[in-house]
Regions:
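N-terminal pre-domain/capping segments
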Residues: 2-158, 174, 191, 222, ...
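Acidic/histidine-rich catalytic cores of soluble enzymes
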Residues: 59, 88-89, 173, 177-279
């Protein structure tokens, strides 16, 4: 199930956020025995709220029968730190309970208390999927998408995130000019705020023809390292291997270490997970591997299985 399926539920639910200067998490908090020490592989791992999206009201499927209590984003940092000893996080935009300044202040304090850091916000908002989104040839449509994305760059800056992920919408390989223009604007805006704007192979052209994303990166600028490679978002193994080899040289913040299904030995069965890790290492990737579990069954267990496999190959 894709995040964009839930965009309609988010429309009208978020207010504009006041612009506040970004701050680093406090360094004066007492040391915590659960924080990974130097050399611990967990320091290279994050967990996305999307892994547990069935426990967030905004993205729970109507037919979901998974047992357990629903989650609130404010409680996510402490829960993940306690349960998995992971202190890097991704917050998907629909999972925010609010974007009012008081809520963001509380959320930032919860991150600090858990000794955790926000790595990325996947910006799944209706404005980025109206018409052609950031790739629409109509300047008015694109302007709305750009404005919506900028609001989330502001939110990310306030929370101290390293990046926000903004989908390009309906990219047209025969005319990348509108898409390039949108990301030039967003990259410049993000740079001024200390936030990278990144792009995922998240279906459509980006997944089926990843070389078009490379053309987009090159069009935005030689120093634009805007890739968010997702291990699973490809139609087949040859495209996956080719796509990851193309995208990882342009990735510096985060990639998605996807978990789908596992055998009795705990190995991912739907795609070649070790090969994905090998490609990332060969490319010299030094960023964060963020877990996105999207398989059947208990998602808490799925996150653990994905974490275990990631630790084996990292």
């Amino acid at each position: 199930m894709r995040r964009r399926d839930f965009l309609a539920r988010t429309a009208g639910g978020l207010a504009a956020v006041a612009m506040v200067r970004a701050g680093e998490p406090r360094r004066d908090t007492a040391p915590d025995a659960g924080i990974p020490g130097a050399g611990d592989k967990r320091r290279r791992i994050a967990i996305s709220t999307w892994s547990l999206h069935q426990y967030f009201s905004a993205t729970r499927g109507k037919s979901s029968a998974l047992p357990g209590e629903m989650l609130e984003l404010l409680d996510f940092p402490a829960m993940i730190a306690d349960r998995y000893k992971i202190h890097h996080l991704e917050f998907v935009a629909p999972h925010f309970g609010s974007v009012e300044p008081s809520y963001l202040k509380d959320l930032k304090e919860r991150l600090t208390k858990a000794h955790s850091h926000l790595v990325n916000i996947p910006v799944d908002i209706p404005e980025l999927h109206k018409g052609g989104g950031l790739s629409d040839p109509d300047d008015t449509v694109r302007a709305a998408g750009i404005a919506g994305a900028k609001k989330w760059i502001d939110i990310g800056a306030e929370l101290g995130t390293r990046a926000v992920r903004c989908d390009p919408g309906r990219m047209k390989p025969e005319n990348l000019a509108p898409t390039i223009d949108s990301y030039k604007q967003l990259a410049a805006y993000g740079k001024a705020k200390g936030v990278d704007v990144i792009i995922e192979n998240h279906g459509g052209v980006g997944s089926e023809r990843p070389e078009e994303l490379v053309k987009l990166f090159q069009g935005v600028g030689q120093d634009f390292k805007g890739a968010l490679p997702d291990f699973a978002n490809f139609p087949d193994e040859p495209t996956r291997e080719r796509g990851l080899k193309l995208l990882f040289p342009y990735a510096r913040v985060v990639c998605h270490a996807k978990g789908l299904e596992f055998d009795a030995q705990g190995n991912e069965t739907r795609f070649n997970f070790p090969k994905c890790m090998e490609i990332s290492k060969q490319a010299g990737f030094q960023g964060i591997y963020s877990i996105e579990f999207e398989g059947p069954g208990d998602p808490y267990l799925g996150v653990q299985k994905t974490l275990d496999e990631l630790l084996r190959h990292l």
